[in-house]
Amino acid sequence: MEVRHNWTVAEVQTLMDKPFMDLIFEAQLVHRKYQQANHVQVSTLLSIKTGACPEDCKYCPQSAHYRTDVDRERLMEVESVLDAAKKAKNSGSTRFCMGAAWKNPKERDMPYLLDMIKGVKEMGLETCMTLGMITAEQAGELSEAGLDYYNHNLDTSPEFYGNIITTRTYQDRLDTLSHVRDAGMKICSGGIIGMGESASDRAGLFVELANLPQHPESVPVNMLVKVKGTPLEDAEDVDPFDFIRLIAVARIMMPESAVRLSAGRESMNEQMQALCFMAGANSVFYGCKLLTTPNPDEDTDMQLFKKLGVNSEQVAQKPDQIQEHELLDRVAERVAARPNKDDLFYEASV
């Protein structure tokens, strides 16, 4: 399998329709050719500005268009962000991602954002931001400050996109990705599964990503988290096997990219997550919350990694150089002390 940029939707649908075992086997072969086996990269995501977003993304509890339980918060102080980054590093993350609920960053906010980037970089962490649409000039400023990654998801296929968002065009998203790449930063871009899209739309999303001039370095695959108050609160559940298939397809189509299990992981049981890793996922967000939605806690993740024999990148880069077996033993003790060990499992149907 060679790295390609000329996929078609029909070709991807044929790939998706392969027998499950054959597809997973093919994805694992590709994974071991291009990626480090039994290895997961760990990132932490912090919401640095929450709620009151003018966009109308139907999946998002931070949109000002919908009534949800998300509290509106102003842009965090730089020192508060740096304190959170220190905690993330001490918990084992190697990349610190900062997200702001904006259509686009205002010029008055740029100095604070640049200081956040510089401060996090000084800790030895990789940096990532998601701030909405950015101009070429803003991309240059972020890059000069040391930003490693910029996240801007395509969300779904061009054909289905208008059913989910009307306040930002698909081309707006592609233009932002172009600005990011031209500024020399790495791209984090993926989509959301479970918004009512068809199999063809799912294939179309991955075609758009894989046919970019250069594949995104990181491809987050989100499973919709249904939030009360949003138009998609009653969306149909995603079939776990369909989701795992899509992880495998992403791995085959973008073999050199990190494929990240992102939102929705809280509702996946251990077995589903294990199959996702087998299908080629090799990155996760670490911590109990992703922006405003739940995420498995750190102890649970480390326990799962231990069961699977997975080495997380974060262990070797802990500031105090705690060895992996020592950390895992401590985690096991903490988990064993819990009153209910069933907390290690999640119902995929929830």
UniProtKB/Swiss-Prot annotation:
CDD domains: Radical_SAM. It catalyses: (4R,5S)-dethiobiotin + (sulfur carrier)-SH + 2 reduced [2Fe-2S]-[ferredoxin] + 2 S-adenosyl-L-methionine = (sulfur carrier)-H + biotin + 2 5'-deoxyadenosine + 2 L-methionine + 2 oxidized [2Fe-2S]-[ferredoxin]. It holds the Pfam family BATS. GO terms for molecular function: 2 iron, 2 sulfur cluster binding; 4 iron, 4 sulfur cluster binding; biotin synthase activity; iron ion binding. GO terms for biological process: biotin biosynthetic process. [2Fe-2S] cluster binds at residues 97, 128, 188, 260. Residues 38-256 form the Radical SAM core domain. [4Fe-4S] cluster binds at residues 53, 57, 60. Pathway: Cofactor biosynthesis; biotin biosynthesis; biotin from 7,8-diaminononanoate: step 2/2. Coiled coil: none annotated. Binds 1 [4Fe-4S] cluster. The cluster is coordinated with 3 cysteines and an exchangeable S-adenosyl-L-methionine. Binds 1 [2Fe-2S] cluster. The cluster is coordinated with 3 cysteines and 1 arginine. Its cofactor is [4Fe-4S] cluster; [2Fe-2S] cluster. SMART domains: BATS, Elp3. Its EC number is 2.8.1.6. Keywords: 2Fe-2S, 4Fe-4S, Biotin biosynthesis, Iron, Iron-sulfur, Metal-binding, S-adenosyl-L-methionine, Transferase. It is an enzyme of class 2 (transferase). Belongs to the radical SAM superfamily. Biotin synthase family. Catalyzes the conversion of dethiobiotin (DTB) to biotin by the insertion of a sulfur atom into dethiobiotin via a radical-based mechanism. PANTHER family: BIOTIN SYNTHASE, BIOTIN SYNTHASE, MITOCHONDRIAL. NCBIfam families: bioB (TIGR00433). Homodimer. This is Biotin synthase. The lineage of its organism: Bacteria, Pseudomonadati, Pseudomonadota, Gammaproteobacteria, Vibrionales.
